[in-house]
């Protein structure tokens, strides 16, 4: 699935002035391209809430170009917690590393026996050609008993998709009920914010 967003070239506009006007400064880049752009902040919010880092966002530019991209980084204002800069990675025919959502299906046998399913990862880092990007990867957990775990190597990847993480990475597990509280405390101690979201300004006020 892909989403579309109007983007405009930046021709000397200062980032601070663009933000005051309700625009979001950004950069679109790859190995062969590096160009400053901006998008409407409200429209970006709408699109990014749906696309996130998992789906292609096609930037529609004023010169008629439509460039497929992935959001690589969003810088947030520390105080207001709203985007103030975005990096778009422009896709080509070369394979790219990206996170693809995992869709868990089935009821584990261990859950029927009183255990609890822990979905440790909701997405997985893969290497894939832009033309083969899957909308999601289905994960069948119905065979998991209490104490069982499912690893990245167990995933049934679509054609053209390769793992970009260790095959031993744990994706899901069925645990006894008494272990749930301990796992919840450990999860709360970890950084909950996605790696793509960064706090603070990184672009100079030109």
From Swiss-Prot:
Pfam families, A to Z: Ribosomal_L25p, Ribosomal_TL5_C
Region (bL25 domain): 1-91
GO biological-process terms attached to the record: translation
Mutagenesis or variant effect for residue 87 to N/S: No 5S rRNA/N-terminal bL25 complex formed
Consequence when changing residue 85 to A/N/T: Destabilizes formation of the 5S rRNA/N-terminal bL25 complex
Any GO molecular function: structural constituent of ribosome
Outcome (variant: residue 85 to F): No 5S rRNA/N-terminal bL25 complex formed
Entries under InterPro entries matching the protein: Rbsml_bL25/Gln-tRNA_synth_N, Ribosomal_bL25/Gln-tRNA_synth, Ribosomal_bL25_b-dom, Ribosomal_bL25_C, Ribosomal_bL25_long, Ribosomal_L25_dom, Ribosomal_uL5_bac-type
SUPFAM superfamilies, A to Z: Ribosomal protein L25-like
Key words, A-Z: Ribonucleoprotein, Ribosomal protein, RNA-binding, rRNA-binding
Region spans: Disordered: 184-206
GO-annotated cellular components: cytosolic large ribosomal subunit
Domain of life of the source: Bacteria
Basic and acidic residues composition-biased segments: 195-206
Effect of residue 10 to A: Destabilizes formation of the 5S rRNA/N-terminal bL25 complex
Region feature (CTC domain): 92-206
Biological function: This is one of 3 proteins that mediate the attachment of the 5S rRNA onto the large ribosomal subunit.
Further information: Despite its considerably larger size this protein can substitute for the endogenous E.coli bL25 protein in vitro.
Subunit record text: Part of the 50S ribosomal subunit. Contacts the 5S rRNA.
NCBIfam families: bL25_bact_ctc (TIGR00731)
Entry comment, domain topic: The N-terminal 91 amino acids are capable of binding to 5S rRNA and also of displacing full-length protein bound to 5S rRNA. The first 80 amino acids are not sufficient.
Family (UniProt): Belongs to the bacterial ribosomal protein bL25 family. CTC subfamily.
This protein's name: Large ribosomal subunit protein bL25
